[in-house]
Amino acid sequence: MSTMPHFSRTLVTTALPYANGPVHLGHLAGVYLPADLYVRYKRLKGEDIIHIGGSDEHGVPITISAEKEGISPRDVVDRYHAMNLDAFTRCGISFDYYGRTSSAVHHATAQEFFSDIEQKGIFQQKTEKLFFDLQAGRFLSDRYVTGTCPVCNNPEANGDQCEQCGTHLSPLELLNPKSKLSDATPELRETLHWYFPLGRFQAALEEYVNSHEGEWRPNVVNYTRTWFKQGLNDRAITRDLDWGVAVPLQSAEAVGKVLYVWFDAVLGYISFTKEWAALQGNAELWKTYWQDPETRLIHFIGKDNVVFHTLMFPSILMAWNEGKTTDCYNLADNVPASEFMNFEGRKFSKSRNYAVYLGEFLDKFPADTLRYSIAMNYPESKDTDFSWQDFQNRTNGELADTLGNFIKRSIDFTNTRFEGVVPASVTKEEWDNLGIDWQATLEQLDSAYEGFHFRDAATLGMEIARAANRYLTSSEPWKVIKVDREAAATTMALSLNLCHALSIALYPVIPETCNRIRAMLGFSEPLEATIQRGTSLLSSLLTPTLQQGHKLREHSEILFTKIEDSAIAPELEKIAKLIAEAEKREAALAESRIEFKPAISFDEFQKVDLRVATVVAAEPVAKANKLLKLRVQVGSLTRQVLAGIAKHYTPEEMVGKQVLLVANLEERTIRGELSQGMILAVENSDGKLFIVQPSGEGINGQSVQ
């Protein structure tokens, strides 16, 4: 089995969900269920582990939600913190502590970090231009600005990202910017902000990430390295807002400013651990989990949060640790970021209500059916898809027919024919001859959980159930008992011990069900009550546990009720409606793109300088999955042009192509890259782009007539 002798304990954190809406199944699959599977398994091993999570209660999305509803940000976060904590609890996500970044302890912790780093002279102050809403009398953070995306012409792009094409933006890049507060056109004004110099820590961060190559998932390492390749830039650490952690300075420049949520939120892991420690009656206990090198720190996140946990948070901790010999923080030993789980072939989208929300799901179906379905579809190395049909099939075919059927048959037959007691003793030899290599299974389970391969772990548990079913069916105790009661008794004793083994092996995945199995087996306490640090319950798989004479509970129960077609029909109707609405929006947007623009005169058209150009080099643009950076030859000149064609052409396909270039288009900067023109392309009804090219070989630089 996997062992880590250099770690005495483990601290698991999970990404903080924004408290401005309910969590959906995509969040559960990517972050919270895998963390819970891991934590529950480590507890079974008797290890010292705590699971810390909580709500991210600051940031622009929350203030926007509050303003839309005409309530305070506090009202918004109170509602969704309670809602999400309730959903997590009902789903069996076993946090040791679930905190809030609006707490006094968190504010003090975040301000302490800011002050420490500020006193070291690490922060930089910069004056920048931001949009200011004259009617509202305030600066506008990125999400308070909307406008037209410069890449795909989506007229409803946000100031931080275009949801349609995925391009990350700044408000200044939007065309026709408008304030979300007043719908007025904002003006640019100067404002002073504090910046964190990420580049100062790049060498240390690269060494840190490189030291974990081979341990971390390739997607985590590779994505982080794309940031290194670009070079790490200064990052704003303050914002002009009135909701958040106030900048702890007395200067006039700090008035009306709060800490940027990227800096504030990750420190919640620390402040929440402090609050947990206080509840244990030892206010200093948190230091053992954050500052003792014997503690292993693991961040469970989705892939959209990678850089915040491989670059941002580590650099903050490095800045704190700088110049200290005590009170230094540990950096994460692993960051097992998941890919995305989509919903019926499309990405989850809260803004478009294309989602299945966790609380609503649990109102209709048992938590363990969802936990199992997602574990078996865990997006470890590639995106996966949740579908109602798959959920129904797994519940009915695997949980009900395989696991539930075996448990009920074993207990019912024992209650009926053997007075509800384990009817025989079972030897180690008989246990080992069941056709299950218990030692190998235990090692495979350990490898799966310790390696964050949760689909493999769930599959191993279900394989035990299949083997148990095969054993009981092939042994036919209902026939054998008529001629050999002793043999039938041995079969049932082995079957009941298999029930117990399943209650251990599948516990991390379906904990409520496993405790129900234990109750039917006659155990008075749930498994959680028997867990002790230093004692592994997994070793009970190696030998039969239930001895002859052990009393079962008098009545069994059906563990899983099959899901009828009628139960998921409303969900399928709902998703069909959502897809139809999405397609309608997309069609309307497509139509809006082909509306004729206002007429121009011939003289105005003559001002457009169209030239034949040849692409001589092409490469992707980091963090903009629709853009290619092209170098084009125009006569004797070379130009750099950014084109939104990366979904339709590879860089290799573009090199050598002749294109038509708008050569006198005003230069602009997109995602930090200069674009000196525009190439022409057309879009078909399926949304595919085609480069407009000369029908014959043109001459570079030749004017288009």
UniProtKB/Swiss-Prot annotation:
Note on how the cofactor is bound: Binds 1 zinc ion per subunit.
EC number: 6.1.1.10
Motif ('HIGH' region): 17-27
Residues noted as binding Zn(2+) in the record, renumbered to the chain: 149, 152, 162, 165
CDD domains assigned: Anticodon_Ia_Met, MetRS_core, tRNA_bind_EcMetRS_like
Transmembrane parts of this sequence: none
Cell compartments where the protein resides: Cytoplasm
Gene3D superfamilies for this protein: HUPs, Isoleucyl-tRNA Synthetase, Domain 1, Methionyl-tRNA synthetase, Zn-domain, Nucleic acid-binding proteins
Catalytic activities: tRNA(Met) + L-methionine + ATP = L-methionyl-tRNA(Met) + AMP + diphosphate
Residue window of motif 'KMSKS' region: 347-351
Sequence similarity: Belongs to the class-I aminoacyl-tRNA synthetase family. MetG type 1 subfamily.
Function: Is required not only for elongation of protein synthesis but also for the initiation of all mRNA translation through initiator tRNA(fMet) aminoacylation.
Subunit structure of this chain's protein: Homodimer.
The protein's name in its UniProt record: Methionine--tRNA ligase
Organism taxonomic ancestry: Bacteria, Pseudomonadati, Chlorobiota, Chlorobiia, Chlorobiales
